[in-house]
């Protein structure tokens, strides 16, 4: 019995170590492309009324933050940085929100920034992580440890068809609503253009 228990304990430890190593290896591969641009589709599912809200546009993931350039159904630009959230309307007017003291904004932006910079340790510090992979496809479900964040955001699921790509993100809110992003036509520029960098600068 003791021998059986020891074997089970050993295999559990090996499995846990393999999970950590695999997730770290994904972050390491993602860090090879610190900038990712492309097209996105977003589906927000409102659980209470069983309704889907669809939108689409272009996006930027970079160490500066995340930018959503929504083109349908209504044009708007939302840039989420580490210190501010900038919403730009079609007429050029901006609404700037200080995000330096907002844990939710910092968490969302910081999560992707940590993944694309290879900083898995930071993610393990802030989230409980369930990682699985099959061949080159992978999926990571991040559950926030911070109660303030968990009160709003239940989990962030990130997945890819290869170790160096993010193809889908599903954010589940505490009330059960979900926001699903699918990414296509992805490109990995070494540097952002001046126009792309300008999204993260308040005028």
PLM region descriptions:
Residues 34-42, 55-59, 68:
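One face of beta-strands
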Residues 58-107, 179:
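An acidic-aromatic
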Residues 120-203:
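Gly/Pro-enriched, hydrophobic low-complexity segments
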Residues 54-56, 73, 81, 150-155, ...:
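Short, surface-exposed coil-to-beta transition loops
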Residues 95-139:
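Flexible, surface-exposed loop/linker segments and immediately adjacent secondary-structure boundaries
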Residues 17-39, 44-50, 196-203:
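N-terminal leader/targeting segments and the immediate start of mature chains
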Residues 4-14:
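Sec-dependent N-terminal signal peptides
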């Amino acid at each position: 019995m003791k021998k059986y228990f020891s074997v089970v304990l050993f295999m559990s430890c090996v499995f846990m170590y393999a999970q950590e190593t695999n997730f770290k290896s994904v972050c390491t591969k993602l860090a090879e492309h610190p900038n990712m641009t492309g097209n996105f589709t977003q589906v927000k599912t409102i659980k209470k009324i069983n309704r889907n809200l669809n939108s689409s546009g272009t996006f930027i993931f970079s160490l500066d933050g995340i930018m959503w350039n929504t083109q349908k159904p209504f044009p708007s630009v939302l840039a989420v940085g580490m210190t501010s959230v900038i919403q730009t309307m079609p007429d050029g007017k901006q609404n700037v929100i200080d995000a330096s003291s907002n844990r939710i904004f910092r968490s969302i932006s910081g999560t992707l920034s940590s993944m694309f910079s290879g900083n898995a340790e930071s993610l393990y510090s802030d989230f409980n992580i369930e990682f699985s992979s099959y061949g080159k496809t992978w999926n990571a479900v991040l559950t926030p440890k911070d109660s303030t964040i968990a009160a709003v955001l239940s989990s962030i699921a990130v997945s890819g068809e290869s170790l160096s790509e993010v193809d889908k993100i599903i954010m589940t809110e505490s009330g059960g609503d979900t926001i699903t992003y699918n990414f296509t036509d992805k490109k990995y520029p070494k540097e952002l253009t001046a126009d792309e960098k300008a999204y993260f600068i308040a005028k």
